[in-house]
Amino acid sequence: TAEETMAEVEKLAEQGLVATFPMKKDIYLMHASYRDKVADDMVAYLEDFHKKNPYRLGSRKAELRVRFLSKLKQNVFDEFMQRLEDTGRIKRSGEFICEGGYEIPHDEVYKQFESALTAMLDKAGFEFIRLADIQLPGIQPAMAEDLLQLLAAEGKVVLLSDDLITLPKYTDMVAEKAREILAAEGKISIAMIRDMIGT
């Protein structure tokens, strides 16, 4: 019967032989040794990922699902990841997952990129810069993209679209001036904003 089966499942769970994932309608089971192997493989993958991509926030959650648990339903996978995060073996940053102890290096490469990009964006003012326009010696395009995403996540730059970049102080100035015009005029247009910033 269903009751007898559940009693046996509970015994196995108490013994640590299976992991249970109770959802709204069903309970999903995973053998504990399989759960541990997947967790170990995932953490090893993330450690290798960080060596190859030191400035990325982590691997995308969807990529990990496809790579390690593609047959698992999304809600069960989410619960698996939450439990793994609760153990401290991984941590999340939005849609990105990294190894639990990983910290992105704020080393010389990071500092030089941040400094050079800030200078470029300051010089550009309200003439926003495109990612393709950023060419710094010794920085490969893929690494520049990673560093840019990192600076955006840290709030040091603003990504206005897929490829337009500026500093937060410029978006803040535009927002403040737009509020002033809106308060004075009762309306605002794109043309008014362009006139206001001189573009």
Report the location of each language-model feature:
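C-terminal non-catalytic scaffold/interaction domains in large multidomain proteins
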Residues: 1-199
